[in-house]
């Protein structure tokens, strides 16, 4: 589905965006990974790895929007959240070098593949849906000293009833991918886990494997 970067007479999907934002926040707060963060049973490096998934997701989607020539307001929101999350992770790691060796979970690889498909198809509706969910997840993430960032901007690429149905379907798919990050972290960092045996991959390892 090829969709222009914006349309003049777009459909109002703001109620859908707001309900999705609330649902994502509630689902994350009930998730096992958040429970382990609350009970301090998740190691600090595992907590950082979890936040890194959302940071990477924000960056991937910003690049996707720019490549597809899509909604610039969504891209700005993604960059703002990525900067805020990156700064929080800089403090957590006490260095910015983690950006070259950050942890990439299996669910992030799946997410990257899906976004690449949407970019190739120039599917602005699908990319916007993933941006909405990722912004909701980033906004809900526990970050010390989290600055106030404006809510998700209006989505202006949904032009038809078919677009609206596709948007709703992609919101659901994006939500499942976001929740999968927490499941990956819990599996990769069980209580008393062996860090060397973790299934987590670093960006450097992935690059080496692709050479």
Language model regions located:
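Metal- and O2-centered redox machinery and metal/ROS homeostasis
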Residues: 1-211
């Amino acid at each position: 589905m090829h969709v222009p970067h914006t349309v003049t007479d777009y459909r109002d999907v703001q109620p859908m965006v707001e309900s999705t934002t609330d649902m994502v926040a509630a689902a994350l707060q009930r998730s096992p990974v958040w429970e382990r963060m609350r009970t301090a049973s998740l190691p600090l490096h595992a907590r950082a790895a979890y936040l890194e998934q959302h940071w990477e997701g924000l960056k991937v989607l910003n690049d996707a929007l720019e490549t597809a020539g899509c909604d610039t307001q969504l891209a700005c929101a993604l960059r703002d959240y990525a900067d805020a999350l990156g700064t929080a992770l800089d403090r957590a790691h006490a260095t910015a070098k983690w950006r070259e060796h950050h942890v990439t979970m299996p669910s992030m690889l799946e997410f990257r593949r899906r976004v690449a498909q949407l970019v190739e198809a120039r599917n602005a509706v699908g990319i916007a849906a993933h941006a909405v969910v990722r912004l909701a997840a980033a906004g809900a993430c526990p970050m010390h000293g989290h600055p106030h960032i404006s809510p998700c901007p209006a989505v202006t690429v949904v032009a038809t009833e078919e677009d609206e149905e596709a948007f709703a379907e992609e919101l659901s798919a994006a939500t499942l991918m976001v929740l999968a990050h927490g499941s990956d972290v819990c599996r990769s960092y069980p209580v008393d886990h062996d860090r060397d045996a973790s299934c987590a991959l670093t960006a450097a390892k992935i690059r080496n494997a692709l050479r």
